[in-house]
A protein has these predicted regions:
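N-terminal Rossmann NAD(P)H-binding glycine-rich loop of SDR-like oxidoreductase domains
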Residues: 1-19
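SDR active-site strand-loop-helix element
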Residues: 3, 43-46, 79-85, 116-118
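A short beta-strand-loop structural module common to alpha/beta enzyme folds
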Residues: 19-29
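NAD(P)H-binding glycine-rich loop region in Rossmannoid oxidoreductase-like domains
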Residues: 31-66, 70-74, 84-89
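Catalytic helix-loop patch of NAD(P)-dependent Rossmann-fold dehydrogenases
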Residues: 59-67, 84-116, 120-121
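Conserved cofactor-binding/catalytic machinery of classical short-chain dehydrogenase/reductase
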Residues: 66-67, 78, 101-102, 154-157
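NAD(P)-dependent short-chain dehydrogenase/reductase
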Residues: 100, 104-151, 155
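C-terminal substrate-binding subdomain of Rossmann-fold SDR/epimerase-dehydratase oxidoreductases
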Residues: 144-146, 153-227
Length: 227
């Protein structure tokens, strides 16, 4: 079973994993009703409402925390939860705290769990973002500074890690990141896109211990992995 299959990593994994059952907003109620009476080898929980500015807190709670609890009540052999390296940020946010609370729910309700904290995700089913606009040369202006730094990992590499982790029955928390961050200027130069940059410098949490670092460096990622 895979959640969040409407777009992003969830959709990519659902399309890549043979015979998997996918959950999105359109079939959520039906699938969850049927799932309680079945048993699953693996549940991969990718769905999350990433809002940083929340207006309806009860809905935010239901979509992110209650849904995680309900998934854990479905009979299963292994549970993989997609988290984020934003939990390492010094500044506090509802996004950070909700991810940490969801992780705690998983840890306390499932012995055979895998929590994977990833950096920024790139793949064919991702929603439009600054990276995609640079790649498509459609970004003309952004509030981000050219010195903003991001850390990217590819859907296909995360999927492969999930498969291998399940086969080897890995348990615990893993940080899945690239070895180096990449500046927005580097990405812009690589794709030959020259937008008007702003002043806001975004930085990615990077000094993370016990990380599975996927690529040699930023240049290797752009030239060899991103094709």
């Amino acid at each position: 079973m895979v959640t969040g299959v409407g777009s992003g990593l969830g959709k990519f994994i659902h399309n890549s994993l043979p015979n998997s059952i996918g959950i999105d907003r359109s079939n959520h109620a039906k699938i969850m009703r049927e799932a309680k009476s079945q048993s699953y080898d693996l549940i991969i929980h990718c769905a999350f409402d990433p809002k940083h500015h929340v207006e309806d807190y009860y809905k935010y709670f239901k979509d992110n925390l209650q849904f995680t609890q309900e998934l854990l009540e479905i009979p299963h052999k292994k549970f993989i939860y997609l988290s984020t390296i934003d939990v390492y940020r010094e500044e506090n946010s509802i996004y950070k705290f909700t991810k940490l609370m969801a992780e705690s729910i998983v840890e306390n309700n499932c012995i055979n769990h895998l929590i994977v904290r990833c950096s920024a995700l790139l793949g064919p089913t991702m929603r439009e973002n600054t990276f995609l606009k640079l790649m498509n040369k459609t970004l003309t202006k952004t509030g981000l500074s050219k010195d903003s730094e991001f850390n990217y990992v590819l859907y296909e590499d995360i999927y492969e890690f999930f498969v291998q982790a399940n086969n080897k029955n890995l348990v615990g928390i893993f940080n899945l990141v690239s070895k180096d961050n990449i500046s927005l200027q580097q990405v812009s130069d690589y794709f030959g896109c020259t937008p008007q940059f702003g002043d806001f410098i975004y930085t990615t949490p990077f000094h993370i211990s016990n990380a599975v670092r996927m690529y040699i460096n930023g240049s290797e990622f752009l030239s060899n992995r991103l094709k």
